[in-house]
Amino acid sequence: MPRRKKKIKEASESQNLEKKDLETSSCVSIKKKRRLEDLLIVISDSDGEETKEENGLQKTKTKQSNRSKCLAKRKVAHMSEEEQFALALKMSEQEAREVNNQEEKEEELLRKAIAESLNSCWSSAASATRSRPLAAELSSHSHQENTKDSGTTEGVWQLVPPSLCKGSHVSQGNEAEQRKEPWDHNENTEEEPVSGSSGSWDQSSQPVFENENVKCFDRCTGHLAEHTQCGKPQESTGSGYAFSKAVQGRGDTSRQCLPIPADTKGLQDTGGTVHYYWGIPFCPAGVDPNQYTNVILCQLEVYQKSLKMAQRQLVKKRGFGEPVLPRPPFLIQNECGQEDQTSDKNEGISEDMGDEAKEERQESRASVWHSETKDFQKSPIKSLKQKLLLEEEPTTSRGQSSQGLFVEETSEEGLKSSEGDNSVPTTQSIAALTSKRSLVLMPESSAEEITVCPETQLSFLEPLDLNREDSPDSRELPIEVRMAVGDKQVANREDCMKENPPPAVSSSTRVSCPLCNQDFPPTKIEQHAMYCNGLMEQETVLTRRRREAKNKSDGRTAAQPALDANRKEKCYLCKSLVPLGEYQCHVEACLQLAKVDREDGIEGTRRPRVCAPVEGKQQQRLKKSKDKGHSQGRLLSLLEQSEHRTTGVEKKPKYSEVRTFRMPSPEVEEASCSREMQSTLSQLNLNESPIKSFVPVSEATNCLVDFKEQFAFRSRTKSGRGRRRKS
């Protein structure tokens, strides 16, 4: 059994080797056929005698090759595995040697051709005389090489005998004489298949190499070019000759080497031939190829330099502009100190007086921030400010709304001491504090400076207590009594202004916010605009601060007085800016007047109106005389009631028209309370409050989101997915 298996294995391996040999032999036969087809064509004018002889030689060669192949196949079939392996190794070594020899020959020929092309151009006569002995020598050399390789390679090719070459020379010479075409001065040697290793190539006929090298002489330049094999001759025409096909290297790619025909008329005029040198495009006759190549290189160098210069001109760097440096801190403080004067230039005398009071309070507040600790024990106002600043801190990061309405905690002793002092000593202490402002606000201590702007600070002397409830007695008092009390308060304030006149400050650089119509300095407008939501922002700030004030005032009997009432708030009824301390009184007066006008329904109610700031002063004076225990304010409730009652009121006039509601001075109060101003109250639109703009989710009709059905829809989809997964 084991012997039979070995025999079977040997038989299978022998079959595989036979198949491989058949494939290799078929490839070799195909190559040989291609070589036969790609033989060098020799042009002659004979009647075809040479072609018949060549065809006979080719047939005999093919028959011999086929016989040798059959014998080799039979031998391989009878060989053992070891013999087949040894034969395969020998064949591979022979092929490698042939390839190496061929590559070396090609390199040598290339070197020689390049050297000769660079030296000089041979004349056609000299090339004709040298062609015949070179052909004889190279043909004998090729015969010797073929005899050496006959034992190792299959299908040895024989070259064309010299008799054919001679015949072709004679026939070509005769034909050239008849045609009289000026291709070369030497008419006897137009086409000669010569093999040589030296000579210059032109672009018209470049050499192509093959295993068996057959070389022909190029008629145009007189140089030598290498070709593969001789083929069928073709009859020559008047335009060109010598179609020479070759196969380059091992790639088996054919190429035609065609001579470029020159212009016959130009040649006749000049009397010479135009030579094209190897490697140089269109080098004219009589010019050194080396010099011509140098000219081309110089042109390329100039072009490259000009291109670089053009690119450098296109790319230009832009210079950096001047740096944007921040302003020094003392300029910012001057702007903050001057921001209130120019904004109120064109307003009345009462507004100017209010601005002066605001500037006084602002200076006193700014001086408290930077005063020393020794001064806090001397003055009760200083100690009160220190306590307030230590206790109170902003609760949010907003630049404008975080410093809204808030109430500070202070002790009852500070409250009593501040109430016990008259207005004159208070102003004197404020003036003493403001005298130190120039020493405190120095640019050296810019890291510790805090710029104070009136729109972002609260009134410490006259705080707005939103949670306190108005007593019924104060609401029942007639407006005439309030007017009388307000006159006294205004007189006291005028005396204070005369004693301590504040410095003149300009506010020409103030910028108004387009959303909330409030004026801010340039240093604060950007920070405010980032978080400003219009009128809704003020309402949210009021409600939030009202909760904080309610929590802080639970354990206190009365609200403390603040140090300043510098901030202005906008009244939603008359659309006018009111000082923060007088805001609540002003709103209540506006509501009462609107209610009276609505109930009467007559525009001619001749009840004299009180100016907004005067009404605020009267109400504040009356409320200070009452008990401090009423801490529940009713501003929001009154606003809501007035909105629900007046749903059909017409839209109010523009802000510029309603602005006449503010009076120039307290001396001209009667003129402000005219019929025209009362008629504007009847046209007030109370529906513009931010509270009314809020719409609950249940009443939203234009919303794209269905708040009621969204949760049910999600539950259905989840249950459906679960069922699908279970199934």
Curated annotation (Swiss-Prot):
Known role: Ubiquitin-binding protein. Specifically recognizes and binds 'Lys-63'-linked ubiquitin. Plays a central role in the BRCA1-A complex by specifically binding 'Lys-63'-linked ubiquitinated histones H2A and H2AX at DNA lesions sites, leading to target the BRCA1-BARD1 heterodimer to sites of DNA damage at double-strand breaks (DSBs). The BRCA1-A complex also possesses deubiquitinase activity that specifically removes 'Lys-63'-linked ubiquitin on histones H2A and H2AX. Also weakly binds monoubiquitin but with much less affinity than 'Lys-63'-linked ubiquitin.
Location of region: UIM-linker: 97-103
Annotated InterPro entries: Rad18_UBZ4, RAP80, RAP80_UIM, UIM_dom
GO cellular component term, pick one: BRCA1-A complex
Modified how: Sumoylated. Phosphorylated upon DNA damage by ATM or ATR.
Swiss-Prot/TrEMBL domain comment: The tandem UIM domains form a continuous 60 Angstrom-long alpha-helix and mediate binding to 'Lys-63'-linked ubiquitins. UIM1 and UIM2 bind to the proximal and distal ubiquitin moieties and recognize an 'Ile-44'-centered hydrophobic patch. Since UIMs don't interact with the 'Lys-63' isopeptide bond the UIM-linker region between the 2 UIM domains determines the selectivity for 'Lys-63'-linkage, and its length is very important for specificity. The Abraxas-interacting region (AIR) mediates the interaction with ABRAXAS1.
SMART domains: UIM (SM00726)
UniProt KW keywords: Chromatin regulator, DNA damage, DNA repair, Isopeptide bond, Metal-binding, Nucleus, Phosphoprotein, Repeat, Transcription, Transcription regulation, Ubl conjugation, Zinc, Zinc-finger
UniProt protein name: BRCA1-A complex subunit RAP80
Biased composition (Basic residues): 60-70
Organism: Mus musculus (Mouse)
Region (Disordered), start-end ranges: 1-23, 45-70, 133-206, 326-427, 607-654
Keyword Cell inner membrane: no
UBZ4-type zinc finger locations on the chain: 510-537
Amino-acid positions noted as binding Zn(2+) in the UniProt annotation, renumbered to this chain: 513, 516, 528, 532
Ranges of biased composition (kind: Basic and acidic residues): 9-23, 176-188, 355-364, 641-654
GO terms of molecular function: DNA binding; histone binding; K63-linked polyubiquitin modification-dependent protein binding; nuclear retinoid X receptor binding; zinc ion binding
Chain positions covered by the region annotation AIR: 270-400
Family: Belongs to the RAP80 family.
Cell compartments where the protein resides: Nucleus
Positions of the UniProt region annotated as Necessary for interaction with NR6A1 C-terminus: 400-508
Pfam family, one: RAP80_UIM
Chain span(s) of sequence motif LR motif: 60-78
Cross-link (Glycyl lysine isopeptide (Lys-Gly) (interchain with G-Cter in SUMO2)): 20, 31, 75, 90, 245, 382, 387, 436, 552, 570, 595, 617, 652, 708
Record field: compositional bias (Low complexity): 195-206
